[in-house]
Amino acid sequence: MTIRSVAKACGVAVGTVYNYFSGKEEFAALVLLTRWKKTTEHIDSVARECAEPETLVRCIYQELCAYMDQYRVLFQDEAAIAVFTASFARYHELLRAQLAKPVRPLCQNDFEAEFVAEALLTWTVAGEGFDEIYQVIRKILN
């Protein structure tokens, strides 16, 4: 992804894009953040309405998969990977906390909620299937 390709896709001049964004990193971050907010809002909504642990954990898994699928091209872009790698440590803790929040009522303590969130985040990104992940998470939630 380049600012030039973004400008072309939007039908505007490259300079116009730079009027709003300092570079492709800022543009990509805004796009990712906008979708991530929708993802967490949906997860929180399901958590409020759902008493069944498997349903909630499946929702989180499916939302993570959908998010990654939507931005797969961006996650494969070498320049984008360099940017994400540089900021990963800073944002990973925040992502984990956001995913731990809806599962906290299912857990005995904050550590378990963070552990479940980390497992979901890590193993979903690694491509593991829901059934394999949930077999382990179910033991923590019981």
What are these regions (language model features)?
Residues 1-26, 30:
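Helix-turn-helix
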Residues 5, 51-56:
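A conserved beta-strand->loop->alpha-helix hinge within the catalytic CA
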Residues 44, 76-85:
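Short linear capping/connector segments at secondary-structure termini
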Residues 55-59, 63, 111-119, 135-136:
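Amphipathic alpha-helical interaction segments
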Residues 59, 69, 82-114, 128-132:
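Amphipathic alpha-helical packing segments from all-alpha helical-bundle domains
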